[in-house]
């Protein structure tokens, strides 16, 4: 079974992103939309006031509203691993085992990467701000997202303030850092735990009927503790249905200073294209330490 530059079969690409959805907070709380390589525009409308009841032959009234479009442009993400050059020599069944393990690992990396990029606006590999590729398209860098100052002694107050900050938007989801979730588990009233579902690092999936997720990606950047908002209606994400896959046998493709042939290795690299868009930053609030 010879490998060169190729793409994952459509079914395998689908499996990768199904796997990613199971590990990504963003994917769990928001809806996915198909994204072509050229990107897509999502129309947004601001409908102020209420509908007008009109009688027969009556004059229709003026309505105050506005509309805009949010661009969702896919960005390229890549991940690669070095494996023994036995990969290119072994039987097809063994190669498929390699690919299955790689596919599962890549799905988890996509999930974590999507969260870190959309939440914090940084390159997941380096932690550096991605000013050109992401810019203000993240919760930490979008100036319309409300900042709530973290108070470890009043986590319930933090969440109440966050929900109040999003105004008329619906609170459809909450993302918690593990530290925040464990803090909720410690809250007691008259000696009774108020949020026992978060004890021992559990991830219950909902809080008072509202979807939530506990994930270390929330605190991947120091000082971030929680995100609250209308994930279902004011945030979209998606992927282009092609994953490029290369088996590289020569050179130093990961710039590690180690020649592949010199170490009897080959390099497996996958590239995917994901995109997301915050339709209105005012629909979200983040709980953070001041100045983070």
Question: Language-model segments: which ranges?
Answer:
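Assembly/oligomerization interface modules of large self-assembling protein complexes
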Residues: 2-80, 283
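Short, Lys/Arg-rich flexible segments
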Residues: 2-6, 10-27, 86-93, 111-118, ...
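Short, Φ-rich (hydrophobic/aromatic) sequence segments
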Residues: 12-25, 98, 102, 106, ...
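Structured loops at beta-to-helix junctions and adjacent beta-edge loops in soluble globular domains
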Residues: 45-48, 84, 177-179, 215, ...
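Short helix/loop capping segments that flank catalytic or ligand/cofactor-binding pockets
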Residues: 52-54, 82-83, 91-92, 183-186, ...
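Alpha-helical scaffold segments that mediate packing/assembly in large oligomeric complexes
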Residues: 84-165, 286-292
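Extended oligomerization regions of viral-like shell subunits
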Residues: 146-259
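Extended, compositionally biased alpha-helical segments that mediate assembly or anchoring
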Residues: 250-292
């Amino acid at each position: 079974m010879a490998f060169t530059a190729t793409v994952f079969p459509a079914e395998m690409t689908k499996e990768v992103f199904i796997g990613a959805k199971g590990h990504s907070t963003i994917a769990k709380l928001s809806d996915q939309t198909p994204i072509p390589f050229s990107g897509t525009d999502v129309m947004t409308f601001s409908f102020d006031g209420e509908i007008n009841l009109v009688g027969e032959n009556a004059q229709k009234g003026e309505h105050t509203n506005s509309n805009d479009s949010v661009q969702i442009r896919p960005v390229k993400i890549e991940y690669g691993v070095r494996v023994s050059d036995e990969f290119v020599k072994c039987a097809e069944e063994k190669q498929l085992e390699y690919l299955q393990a790689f596919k599962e690992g890549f799905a988890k990396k996509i999930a974590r990467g999507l969260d870190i990029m959309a939440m914090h606006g940084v390159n997941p590999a380096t932690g550096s701000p991605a000013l050109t590729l992401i810019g203000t398209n993240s919760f930490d860098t979008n100036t319309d997202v409300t900042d709530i100052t973290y108070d470890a002694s009043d986590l319930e107050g933090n969440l109440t303030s966050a929900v109040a900050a999003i105004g008329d938007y619906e609170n459809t989801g909450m993302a918690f850092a593990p530290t925040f979730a464990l803090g909720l588990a410690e809250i007691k009233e008259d000696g009774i735990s108020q949020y026992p579902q978060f004890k021992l690092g559990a991830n219950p999936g909902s809080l008072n009927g509202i979807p939530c997720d506990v994930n270390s990606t929330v605190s991947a950047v120091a000082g971030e503790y929680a995100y609250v908002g209308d994930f279902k209606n004011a945030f979209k994400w998606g992927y282009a249905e092609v994953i490029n896959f290369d088996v590289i046998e020569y050179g130093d493709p990961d710039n590690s200073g180690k020649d592949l042939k010199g170490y009897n290795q080959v390099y497996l690299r996958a590239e995917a294209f994901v995109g997301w868009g915050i339709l209105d930053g005012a629909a979200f609030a983040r709980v953070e330490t001041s100045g983070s």
